[in-house]
Structure formats: structure tokens, C-alpha cells
């Protein structure tokens, strides 16, 4: 494996430019996005709809006893998670790796079959993503216990989560292109860039999350409370389209950061939009 070493002369990460170029890249490659994401969006939307219909029942508020309400809440929340976590993890991993490689290895032109074939890089990528999630959860739990005494600390906790994620996240694009960075190497690679990583990731995550949430709220108003197959499918389909667009933007940001840090220059993306 080829391990890119930290570049002492790497210039500071350009925050705004990185975000703009990531968004531009997704727009430029919108046809490729549809090709790569459509299988995941379609399959997950069907599964979401089927699971929702299978588990449809009375609202927890309409049930008589606390035990019934608890059982209904578990059924409505935990069971869908357990049923969908494996296909979600599979499609998220295969798409994220394909999108990382789309930017970092532009000459690589895999077929859909090759994109969906699980390889050792997928296992490494998924395990490191799980590791990042565990680190974030631990920081949140520890921070939340401290914030109980001083609520203002919650802001610092969230900042710490984003900062640590930024420092460690370079294992993901590295795994996607078989460079094999460890968490320690990612931490070393991002030395001196913490504030800019925080600004870049925070300015990507939060507006994207707000936009997706608003779009879903608008969709819910349009479709109402209908529990029909078509209404559930449309809701799931649009939600998955928005979700994978958010993934594509986030992955593009990490790829641009990795490209910038590993070669010590500003990543170059043709800014032509059309």
C-alpha cells in the first residue's frame, strides 16, 4: 500500500473554495451521480416502503397502556433500523467509495457491477467509518454529561466532535483508493489544519442537514399522512435522493481535502458548470 506522508509545505486548506468546488463537482458529474446512486436509491426506497407497511399499526399515543406504547415505539424505531441497517451500510459504502474514486481516480471507469462488488477496500472503509462513529459518540456522551452542569459546554462538545472527525476522516478517502492510512496517519496528515477542517466540514454538514430537513418537511406537507404504498414510496424515494446528494457533497469535500493535503497544493477542479 502507498501511504502518502504529511506535506509540511502544504498551504492552508481553502475553506470556501473547497466547499464551492465540491458542490460544483457534484453538479458537473450529475449524470454519473444518477448512474451510481440510482440502484441504491431505488432498492432502499422499496425496502423502506415495504418495512413501513409491514410495521404499520396504531400510533403510540392511541394505545392504552405504557407497555403498549413502549412496544409500539420500539417497533416503529428499532425494528426498521435492524431490518435496514445491512442494505443501508452496503449501498452507502459502495456509493461513497465509488464517489471518492470518481474524484481521486478520474481515469477509473468501473461498471455498475464493479461498483457494487464488495472488496477488501469496502470492508476497511466501513470499519473505519464505524470507528469514526464510535469516536464521535464517545465524545458526545462524555461531553453531554459535562454539559449537564454547564449547558454552554454543549457547543464546545459539538465543535470537538467536528474537529476530531475532520482530523481522523482522511482514512476514508485513503481507504477508497487503497492507500491505507491509519487513524494516526490521518491525524498527522491534518496537523496544522484543524480550524480550517472544522470550518469546512461544519459549513458543509449543517447547511446540508437544514436543506434536507426543510425539503422533507415540505414533502410531508404535500403528501399529508397518507399511508398508501405510493405515498410512502415517494416519501422514501425523495428522502433517499436528498440523502445521497448530501453524501456526494460530503464525500467530495473529503476527497478535495485529501487531494490538497497529500500533494500539498490546492485541488484543481474545472469550474465550468455546464
Feature annotation, model-predicted:
Residues 6, 10-46, 114-138, 163-212, ...:
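Interfacial aromatic "cap" segments that immediately flank transmembrane helices
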Residues 42-45, 49-53, 57-60, 74, ...:
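N-terminal topogenic module of multi-pass integral membrane proteins
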Residues 141-156:
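Short hydrophobic membrane-inserting alpha-helices and related fusion/pore-forming segments
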Amino acid at each position: 500500500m502507498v501511504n502518502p506522508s504529511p506535506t509540511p509545505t502544504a498551504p492552508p486548506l481553502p475553506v470556501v473554495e473547497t466547499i464551492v468546488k465540491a458542490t460544483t463537482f457534484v453538479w458537473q458529474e450529475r449524470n454519473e451521480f444518477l448512474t451510481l446512486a440510482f440502484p441504491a436509491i431505488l432498492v432502499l426506497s422499496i425496502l423502506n416502503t415495504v418495512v413501513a407497511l409491514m410495521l404499520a399499526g396504531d400510533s403510540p399515543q392511541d394505545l392504552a397502556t405504557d407497555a403498549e406504547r413502549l412496544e409500539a415505539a420500539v417497533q416503529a424505531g428499532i425494528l426498521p433500523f435492524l431490518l435496514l441497517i445491512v442494505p443501508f451500510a452496503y449501498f452507502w459504502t459502495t456509493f461513497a467509495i465509488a464517489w471518492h474514486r470518481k474524484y481521486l481516480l478520474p481515469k477509473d471507469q468501473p461498471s455498475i457491477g464493479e461498483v457494487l462488488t464488495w472488496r477488501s477496500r469496502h470492508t476497511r472503509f466501513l470499519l473505519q467509518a464505524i470507528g469514526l462513529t464510535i469516536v464521535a459518540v464517545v465524545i458526545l456522551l462524555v461531553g453531554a454529561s459535562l454539559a449537564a452542569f454547564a449547558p454552554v459546554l454543549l457547543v464546545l462538545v459539538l465543535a470537538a466532535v467536528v474537529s476530531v472527525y475532520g482530523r481522523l476522516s482522511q482514512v476514508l478517502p485513503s481507504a477508497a483508493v487503497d492507500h491505507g492510512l491509519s487513524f494516526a496517519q490521518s491525524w498527522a496528515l491534518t496537523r496544522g489544519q484543524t480550524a480550517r477542517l472544522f470550518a469546512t466540514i461544519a459549513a458543509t454538514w449543517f447547511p446540508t442537514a437544514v436543506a434536507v430537513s426543510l425539503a422533507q418537511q415540505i414533502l410531508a406537507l404535500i403528501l399529508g399522512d397518507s399511508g398508501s404504498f405510493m405515498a410512502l414510496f415517494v416519501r422514501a424515494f425523495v428522502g433517499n435522493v436528498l440523502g445521497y446528494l448530501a453524501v456526494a457533497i460530503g464525500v467530495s469535500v473529503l476527497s478535495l481535502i485529501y487531494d490538497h493535503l497529500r500533494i500539498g497544493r490546492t485541488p484543481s477542479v474545472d469550474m465550468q458548470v455546464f
